């Protein structure tokens, strides 16, 4: 009987270690950055524009994430850009992907159409770009890999992250 109790106790401790070992506390600096970003987003004035974060992946054709002002990044949509009226910033400079992770104020609208992207085998909303303003070349992190800082571009080449 005593051996059975020891076995159950050891099993419970092992199981607890597995479950709680995956729990991760967020470092204080990162938590502060998230709070500041939330406050900044909440202070964005309403208007006829969107906030975009360029998300460049060499094998994919989507442009990046787009959200409405005042809304958190978790509500952003990964979009295909319609550039018939205005070229994307990196395409305008003929320096594709050079603006990865830049943040923009975007002028335009969602067309209501969906566009197939073959590399990801995904269907994304189309955003018709009419203009843009650069907000930041070094905005706060919005992806889990940026918070952790331990993933290399090679590790993430075929991973499509979602903002948090």
What is the meaning of each model-derived region?
Residues 19-22:
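C-terminal motif of bacterial Sec signal peptides marking the signal peptidase cleavage site
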Residues 1-9:
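Bacterial N-terminal signal peptides that target proteins for export
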Residues 12:
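Generic anion/oxyanion-binding catalytic loop in active/binding sites
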Residues 25-164:
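OB-fold and OB-like single-stranded nucleic-acid-recognition modules
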């Amino acid at each position: 009987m005593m051996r059975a109790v020891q076995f159950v106790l050891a099993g419970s401790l092992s199981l607890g270690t597995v479950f709680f070992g995956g729990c991760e506390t967020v470092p204080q600096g990162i938590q502060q950055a998230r709070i500041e970003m939330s406050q900044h987003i909440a202070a964005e004035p309403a208007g006829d524009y969107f906030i975009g974060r360029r998300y460049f992946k060499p094998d994919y054709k989507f442009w990046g994430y787009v959200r409405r002002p005042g809304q958190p990044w978790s509500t952003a949509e990964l979009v295909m850009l319609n550039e018939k009226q205005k070229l994307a910033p990196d395409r305008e400079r003929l320096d594709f992907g050079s603006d990865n992770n830049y943040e923009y104020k975007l002028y335009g609208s969602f067309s209501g159409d969906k566009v197939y992207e073959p590399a990801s085998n995904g269907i994304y909303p189309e955003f018709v770009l009419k203009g843009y303003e650069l907000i930041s070349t070094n905005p706060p992190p919005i992806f889990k890999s940026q918070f952790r800082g331990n993933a290399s571009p090679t590790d993430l080449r075929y991973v499509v992250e979602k903002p948090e």
